Amino acid sequence: MFFHLQQQQDNAFAQTATTVINNNNTAANITLGNPQIIYTEYGKTTNMIPFVVNGTHGSRLSFIGNGTIQGINVTDNGRAISISKADGSIFSRGVGILTANASSRGIAAFSFIGTGHYGTDGKLRDFGPIYFLNATGNLASLKGAAGIYKDQINKAGNAVTKLWLWKQ
């Protein structure tokens, strides 16, 4: 069995080695667009439950926040898992829902991944990608958008989050 897999791998490498990459100018036309800060949120961690799994420390948490995105006042509700890494960094993954506070209510569901560190002032500063999976109503323009967020969370759980958004 191992010999057969090794032979397939060798064949794949042999085929790959003969592939020629044509470097044309089409890549030069790719841009990142003009990302802008479109959202600032003021939030708070509402619940934090520490856990340890196989010696790895982390927390399950929930959060709420308020902000304005594309001129629409929204409330954010979400949850995340944060894991402490051996190098002192923090890895987070979570989901949330922005809900418009307007008469033509809309929602925008998102997921995010982040990494960060605690500063000497005790504040967690982290950043990462955010993906809007679905959106309706007056937030429908966010559907399929991706962005980068950056936030700062103090010891009391108060957070400020900024979002740069890309949409094709």
Indicate residue ranges for each PLM-predicted region.
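Beta-strand-enriched cores of mature, soluble protein domains
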Residues: 2-168
